[in-house]
Amino acid sequence: KFAEEVADLSDGKMKIQVYANSTLGGDRDLLETCSDGDIPFVVQNTAPQVTFLPDTAVFDLPSAFTTIQQARAAVDNEEFYQKMEKVYQKGGYKLLGYADQGFRVMSTNKNVKSINDFKGQKIRTMENSYHLKFWKTLGANPTPMTFSEVYIGLQQGTIDAQENPYEVIVSSKLYEQQDYVVETNHLPHYISLIVSDEFYNLSLIHISEPTRHLRI
């Protein structure tokens, strides 16, 4: 839908070709290739960005919000957004906006009735030191893993659990390998829309040139 809107609003001057489900690489690969300009546009969860943009750790504070409306209001705050624009710009990116997929929840094959039930569970997390510390604090055994490996990891028993928003759990059919969902709601699943800063500036200059094709 986004690609269609861009083509329509630019009168066909810009066309986006979408590559979903890590087709163009993992989270780290996407950030590096976006910075280099090979993939000019990336739609990505904020969590993997902390390695390249340390100040994005502000999104990794667990249990900061009780409702998704509070979480959305936080990133919509004009002063906050302007500060984050500078963070991305310093890293060589242009921030176009934020979206979300609701809160992240935990799916598992063990019925979690108390905090003690987290102990020892091998849970897949993203490659983010703050996420790892959170789950270790609960007594779990967090394991960083690229998302494309999660389904087979659950299937083969490499991991016992994972955490994602409901939309991701359903669309990827992770429920086929899990018995329970625990509404931890520990973090909002923020999505950032970024382009390389160089590409953004060039696009402003050359938008009147023949149709441009983008990969995201």
Question: Which ranges hold each PLM region?
Answer:
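N-terminal secretory/targeting leader peptides
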Residues: K1-A71, E79, M84-S208, R212-R215
